[in-house]
């Protein structure tokens, strides 16, 4: 986290310099305000990361000799035979085609998305009365 905090603080310094240069040269208030707000956001994130890095133990990303696998945690449960992602993919494709070809396609895509989402969330749910 130390490296990420330093990166955001240096990014904030760069954004501040660009905001001052942009504000002086362009005299345009909207872009100058947006750049100063981006500076503030970057400072807040950088300070938070630097402050948190002092409170927690050093992670694998702070060690220059670490491998990627050193920081990898448990990925989670994988459902190899699930059809629900296919339903969500088809529904999402129809929804985005509705943006291109006509909003009427959303009437067909919304039920497919809802069925796919409902099925994926409750795929392994067996009820409250059963014990695992």
UniProtKB/Swiss-Prot annotation:
Reactions performed catalytically: 4 Fe(II)-[cytochrome c] + O2 + 8 H(+)(in) = 4 Fe(III)-[cytochrome c] + 2 H2O + 4 H(+)(out)
Presence of the UniProt keyword Membrane in the record: yes
Gene Ontology MF terms: cytochrome-c oxidase activity
EC number: 7.1.1.9
GO cellular component terms attached to this protein's record: plasma membrane
Major location category of this protein: membrane
Keywords, alphabetical: Cell membrane, Membrane, Translocase, Transmembrane, Transmembrane helix
Enzyme class: translocase
UniProt-annotated location(s): Cell membrane
Pfam families: Cyt_c_ox_IV
Membrane topology of this protein: Multi-pass membrane protein
Transmembrane region(s): 5-25, 33-53, 86-106, 107-127
GO biological process, one term: electron transport chain
Stored InterPro entries: Cyt_c_oxidase_su4_actinobac (IPR021050)
Function of the protein: Part of cytochrome c oxidase, its function is unknown.
Annotated family: Belongs to the cytochrome c oxidase bacterial subunit CtaF family.
Subunit description: Associates with subunits I, II and III to form cytochrome c oxidase.
Record's protein name: Probable cytochrome c oxidase polypeptide 4
Classification lineage: Bacteria, Bacillati, Actinomycetota, Actinomycetes, Kitasatosporales
Gene behind this protein: ctaF
